A protein has these predicted regions:
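Aromatic-rich carbohydrate-binding modules that target alpha-glucans
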Residues: 1-2, 6-30, 38-58, 107, ...
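Catalytic cores of glycan-processing enzymes that make or break glycosidic bonds
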Residues: 80-103, 107, 154-157, 188-869
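Catalytic "initiation/cleavage/transfer" segments centered on a nucleophilic residue
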Residues: 63-65
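Boundary detector for helix-to-coil junctions that initiate low-complexity/charged tails
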Residues: 67-71
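Primarily marks secretory-pathway-exposed extracellular/lumenal segments that are disulfide-
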Residues: 74-75
Length: 869
């Protein structure tokens, strides 16, 4: 139980702080406590408290504990203290008892997280109780509060001064295997009185042993295929994927977001990063076999037939799968729902999750009833009212059965994912989730808590290797000022919920916590966006770089006769007659008012999918974005240089002097101006968010990275993402796996990229350079990535210094010609440049076949072992 006493400490010298506290002996025999700094009654600083301080006390009301602690900052190796290690990778499932208490006791505590359950920490020193410097007779320490270790020795039998060291002890072999990497520790006589125990804590222990490194597999849940799945991967399949990870000695399984994305019940809902709830899971991930069989054998036989048909498809048929699964949900709910909803297990789940479960269920019901997820268009309940929602959810309401089915589905999804989580933890595998940076503007959160979001803008990403026009995710941005006022409670709840199922997570687009790329609602592409928050430039500041400010020329699309033919070819005259009009300036045009935004152009071409229409539409998009500066969203008299404009015609229209001035301005704005500012923004949010749970934090730090990102992630011990074909150093074409930082996750490809085999065939000149410079081969590169080449690339990544090497399932399988997919193009999961991409890739063989693919599995096992992972 937590100690609820708050007591002030006092100091005489400004360094050492003391207090005396009288407490009752707690029922469970332990006291939790922590230290905070207060000013004017408010907490202004809290020590690192992911692992609370625990003192196990004797059942003796006269006992005095003298505690010597030091303030705890975030440990340098904080990642080893996360639940990924303490609950899974290096878990101690059978803990020893609390140390025996003595009349005069010396309790020594130390932190040592990198010790597996076959070993323990021990104390060896110049006393008989500590082995008289014989490490094999050292005093074994208790792991009751692992990764903190503790032992109490009888101070009455100690002849001070005390000298000691920590040793690593092998419990099976009953011998010490390593001394700590530290000089002898020394303690003068602390004058311990009768009925007193001196507790000395905050020792950190390090050994000169090889650094822990692990490997893992990344695969979307929807991509899993087993003999039992129903045309899409489910949480039952996730357990089977964990079994494969165990069989190949991998330590992590990484998945994509699994939240409900249902808006239209069409394939466009397949995009996993635009959910309608940050809590609810997608119903399609339910393992129907775990829900039970229908009593109607004829109907059940029909579903079994459909299961085989859908499961035989090479890719996910999103609409057919979800339609069929929902038919099953309705039937099984009618058969089992009343009993399940009356169970104690469900009631406990409901009470713990009611805050999000009830609004989600009502939102889903109203979405289908009103045939739109856009709650602003609902004839009733468009504005969230808790009392009205509560009335709808009453069991005697006519709407209740339509709402309660969502309770039933979410409860079963919770049980199934939790079972997969527990299966992973029991087998020493970390389940790594994915937290999208955004939410959908048509979501439960936008409906229920609109004050947290800026719904008049669109989140996205500036141009990068994934997309030359930037990315427009269409998601609202966060109102961080409002979130800050309640201590980021919205995010805290989100992280706490995720920690129920995951021991590690990837922050999708971690840059969003520094700044987000916000695109105006009238834009389709990402080029017209601006960073938020940002420091826009005044007219005077722009001119201070030597660039005379010309408002009409800099802020309006530059459309000149000479390049229209280059863009539109045979359609040039049609474009002139329909979409643009001449100005008073010779050979200069402007957009007609009915087509002067990208959204207006998009609306005009809606439903037109022929090549000519797309050619003209994309050309018009390019014309509209051909501006030198973008007005600030809050102050139209301040400006942001348009991202990537050096590739456009308006930049070419500048003279050499103007180009040089603009380049100086552009470089200062995008690479220097905001470093401290954005770093401060991130440090307002990320420390308390990343430390609100004990999950291992990994950041997706790809794209246009300001310098402040590296130092913030380093200060907060967040693992970076390293990808060889997207090096952090812009002067390098490829990253060097030997140079990767230890605090990182390395991979060959992400879900937003082509696989290793796909990339090999995209740009043969680049592939040739990689073949010669990075792999060290002479001569011409093969036209395709052979299994031997793929194995070489995989091995290089396994040899990297990164603490985790997590490869896509496709890249693992690329090493075996027998088992890899014969069709390389089928393996790509997402194409970021296409906002309407269909997310439907499925592994081409079943998990049962994968488990029996011994040539591949043995190769993976041996490579992992030989590379020390």
């Amino acid at each position: 139980r937590q100690m609820c006493i708050r007591d002030s400490l006092h100091t005489v010298d400004g360094i050492h702080w003391t207090a005396e506290v009288d407490i009752q002996i707690p029922g469970n025999g332990s006291v939790e406590y922590s230290y905070h700094i207060y000013r004017d009654g408010r907490t202004i600083r809290t020590e690192w408290n992911s692992l609370p301080r625990i003192l196990h006390v004797a059942d003796n009301p006269k006992k005095v504990y003298r505690i010597e602690d030091c303030w705890k900052n975030l440990p340098e190796q904080q990642y080893f203290y996360t639940s990924a290690f303490t609950e899974s990778l290096l878990a101690h499932r059978e803990r020893s008892a609390a140390p025996k208490s003595y009349k005069k006791g010396l309790l020594i505590k130390a932190y040592a997280p990198c010790i597996d359950s076959d070993h323990c920490l021990a104390l060896c020193g110049n006393q008989k109780a500590l082995g008289d410097w014989n490490p094999d007779k050292a005093a074994l320490m208790s792991d009751i509060d692992f990764p903190e270790w503790q032992v109490e020795v009888d101070a009455g039998k100690i002849s001070f001064p005390l000298e000691y060291k920590f040793v690593l002890y092998n419990k099976k072999e009953r011998r010490a295997v390593a001394w700590e990497n530290n000089p002898n520790r020394y303690m003068a006589d602390p004058q311990i009185a009768a009925n007193e125990t001196l507790a000395v804590g905050d020792r950190y222990v390090y050994f000169n042993l090889p650094a822990w490194k692990g490997s893992g597999v990344a695969v979307p849940v929807f991509s899993l295929r087993s003999e039992k799945s129903f045309g899409v991967g489910d949480f039952g399949d996730l357990k089977r994927m964990i079994d494969w990870a165990v069989a190949t000695n991998q330590k992590a399984v990484q998945i994509l977001p699994i939240n409900d994305t249902t808006m239209t019940h069409t394939w466009t809902d397949s995009y996993p990063y635009s959910s309608i709830s940050i809590y609810a899971f997608h119903p399609m991930y339910a393992d129907l076999k775990q829900l039970g069989s229908l009593k109607d054998k004829k109907v059940m036989a029909e579903f079994n037939k459909r299961q085989k048909e859908l499961n035989a498809l090479p890719a996910v048929d999103y609409e057919a799968v979800n339609k069929t699964k929902w038919e099953y949900f309705h039937l099984i709910f009618k058969q089992e729902g009343e009993k399940v909803l009356a169970s104690d297990a469900f009631r406990n789940f409901y009470e713990a999750n009611k805050e999000w479960l009830q609004p989600y269920a009502v939102f889903s019901y109203l979405r289908d009833a009103y045939k739109t997820p856009n709650f602003r268009e609902w004839p009733k309940y468009a504005t969230y009212d808790a009392k009205e929602i509560e009335t709808l959810c009453r069991p005697d309401s006519a709407d209740y059965p339509h709402i309660a089915i969502y309770y039933y589905i979410q409860f079963n999804l919770h049980l199934q994912l939790l079972a997969a989580t527990e299966h992973a933890r029991a087998n020493g595998v970390v389940l790594k989730g994915d937290i999208p940076i955004g939410i959908s503007r048509n979501s439960v959160e936008a409906w229920k808590e609109p004050h947290y979001f800026n719904l008049n803008g669109q989140a996205g990403a500036p141009p990068d290797d994934f997309s030359v026009n930037g990315q427009n995710w269409g998601l609202p941005t966060y109102n961080w000022d409002v979130m800050e006022k309640d201590g980021y409670a919205w995010w805290m709840k989100r992280f706490h919920k995720m920690a129920e199922y995951f021991d590690a997570y990837r922050i999708d687009h971690i840059l969003g916590f520094f700044r987000i790329w916000e695109i105006p609602m009238h834009a389709v592409h990402g080029l017209l966006g601006q960073f938020v928050p940002a420091l826009p430039m005044t007219r005077e500041e722009i001119e201070s770089y030597g660039l005379a400010f010309r408002e009409d020329f800099f802020l309006k699309p530059y459309i000149h006769e000479y390049f229209l033919g280059q863009i539109f070819g045979p359609h040039t005259d049609y474009v002139k007659q329909t979409f643009i009009e001449p100005t008073d300036t010779w050979e200069i045009y402007r957009m007609r008012p009915e087509f002067d935004t990208q959204r207006k152009v998009e609306a005009y071409f809606a439903g037109k999918t022929d090549d000519d229409s797309i050619w003209i539409r994309d050309g018009l998009y390019a014309l509209i974005s051909d501006v030198l500066f973008v007005p600030d969203r809050n102050n139209p008299h301040e400006y942001h240089p348009r991202i990537g404009v050096q590739h456009d015609y308006i930049y070419r229209a500048l003279n050499d002097w103007e180009k040089a001035a603009f380049n100086r301005l552009y470089d200062q704005y995008y690479y220097h101006r905001h470093n401290d500012f954005w770093g401060q923004q991130a440090m307002k949010k990320l420390p308390q968010l990343t430390q609100s749970t004990r999950m291992l934090v990994c950041g997706e730090d790809l794209g246009m990275i300001p310098d402040c990102v590296a130092w913030v992630m380093n200060d907060l011990r967040i693992l970076s993402l390293e990808i060889q074909r997207m090096p952090k150093d812009p002067k390098q074409e490829f990253g060097h796996t030997d140079w990767y930082p230890y605090r990182s996750v390395c991979t060959i490809s992400t879900h937003d990229m082509s696989t290793l085999r796909g990339w090999w065939e995209e740009d043969f000149q680049q592939t040739q350079r990689y073949y010669n410079t990075m792999l060290g081969h002479y001569g011409a590169a093969p036209a395709t990535a052979t299994p031997e080449l793929c194995e070489e690339v995989v091995r290089n990544h396994l040899h990297s210094n990164s603490i985790l090497c997590i490869l896509s399932l496709q890249d693992w399988m690329s090493m075996d010609g027998k088992w890899r997919n014969p069709n390389v193009q089928e393996e790509r999961i997402n194409i970021p440049a296409n906002p309407r991409h269909y997310w439907r890739w499925r592994m081409h063989l079943t998990l049962e076949q994968l488990m029996k693919a011994e040539s591949l599995n043995e190769k993976i096992r041996s490579m992992i072992e030989s590379t020390g992972r």
